[in-house]
C-alpha cells in the first residue's frame, strides 16, 4: 500500500461515515499520525529487537497492520501525496513546497462539519511559495518549520501557535508541547467530530536525548535515536490516553505511518542483518528507504 492510498482509505471511511451515520449524533473522529524519518524496522510490532514501541504495538494488535506500505524516499513528496491523495507525478512542485490550488483532505473533512487541526512539522511553505496551515484547511495549528520559526524543533522549540511564533524556554521539549496542543484541541472539540493531523517531528535528526532518556547528556546517535523512537511511541500513547479519558476512543480512527525510511547515518538491525538506514538523500532506492509502517 502506498501513501496516497492511505489518503484514499481514510477519505473513504469519512464518506462512509457521513452516509451511514448521517442520522446519528456522532461521526468518526480521525487522528492521522505521520512520523518523520523512521522505517518499519524500528517497530517491535514488525519484529524489531532493538526498539520498544508498546503503544503502537497495541494499536497494531487491536486494529490492522500492513506488511507492505511504501512511501516516497523523501519527506515533502510523501506529505504532498498524503494530503492530496495524488501521485507526485501530477502535483509535486519542489522540496518544502505545497502546490497552491490543490485541495487537501482537511477541506473534505471541513465540508463534513469537522473541526480540523495540524500539529507538528509543516515544511510546506517558503517565503516565496507554498501554503500555510490555514490555507490548507486547518482551523488550528501548532507547527515547526514554517517562515518565522527558528531551527530548534526539540529542546527550546520554536513553534508557530495559531499564527504566532513562540520561542519556548530551554526546559521545553518540542514533541511534548505539540502533543499537549493536540490533546487540548481534542478536549476542546470533544462534542463535535474532529480531524487531528499529527505530522510528528520525531524521530528526525538531530539525534538528541529526550525527556525520558536515562542519560540527558548522551552523544551516542544510535542510543538517542532509539530513545526518540520510544518517545514517539509515548506521545502516541498520550493521544490515545486522552481519547480514552474523554470516552472518545471507540469513536476515533487512529492511523499511524511515516514519510520515509530511517536516516542513512544510522546502522540498525534489519531483521537479522546490520544495515544502514536509507532515507534517500541519495538515489539508491531500497526497501530501507521506502518501507514504512502502517
Predicted features and spans:
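Single conserved hydrophobic/aromatic residue that forms the stacking wall/gate
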Residues: 281-294
Amino acid at each position: 500500500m502506498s501513501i496516497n492510498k492511505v489518503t484514499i482509505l481514510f477519505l473513504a471511511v469519512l464518506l462512509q461515515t457521513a452516509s451511514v451515520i448521517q442520522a446519528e449524533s456522532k461521526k468518526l473522529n480521525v487522528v492521522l499520525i505521520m512520523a518523520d524519518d523512521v522505517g518499519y524496522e524500528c517497530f517491535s510490532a514488525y519484529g524489531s529487537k532493538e526498539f520498544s514501541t508498546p503503544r503502537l504495538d497495541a494499536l497494531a494488535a487491536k486494529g490492522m497492520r500492513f506488511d507492505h506500505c511504501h512511501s516516497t524516499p523523501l519527506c515533502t513528496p510523501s506529505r504532498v501525496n498524503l494530503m492530496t491523495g495524488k501521485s507526485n507525478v501530477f502535483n509535486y512542485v519542489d522540496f518544502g513546497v505545497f502546490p497552491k490550488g490543490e485541495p487537501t483532505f482537511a477541506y473534505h473533512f471541513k465540508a463534513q462539519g469537522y473541526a480540523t487541526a495540524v500539529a507538528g512539522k509543516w515544511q510546506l511553505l517558503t517565503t516565496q511559495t507554498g501554503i500555510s496551515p490555514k490555507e490548507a484547511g486547518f482551523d488550528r495549528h501548532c507547527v515547526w518549520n514554517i517562515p518565522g520559526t527558528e531551527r530548534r524543533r526539540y529542546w527550546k522549540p520554536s513553534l508557530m501557535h495559531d499564527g504566532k511564533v513562540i520561542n519556548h524556554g530551554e526546559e521545553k521539549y518540542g514533541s511534548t508541547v505539540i502533543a499537549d496542543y493536540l490533546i487540548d484541541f481534542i478536549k476542546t472539540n470533544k462534542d463535535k467530530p474532529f480531524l487531528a493531523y499529527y505530522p510528528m517531528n520525531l524521530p528526525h535528526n538531530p539525534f538528541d536525548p529526550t525527556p525520558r532518556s536515562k542519560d540527558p547528556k548522551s552523544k551516542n546517535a544510535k542510543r538517542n535515536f532509539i530513545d526518540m523512537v520510544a518517545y514517539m511511541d509515548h506521545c502516541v500513547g498520550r493521544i490515545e490516553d486522552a481519547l480514552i479519558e474523554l470516552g472518545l476512543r471507540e469513536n476515533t480512527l487512529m492511523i499511524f505511518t511515516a514519510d520515509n525510511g530511517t536516516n542513512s547515518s544510522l546502522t540498525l538491525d534489519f531483521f537479522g542483518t546490520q544495515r544502514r538506514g536509507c532515507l534517500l538523500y541519495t538515489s539508491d532506492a531500497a526497501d530501507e528507504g521506502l518501507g514504512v509502517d502502517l
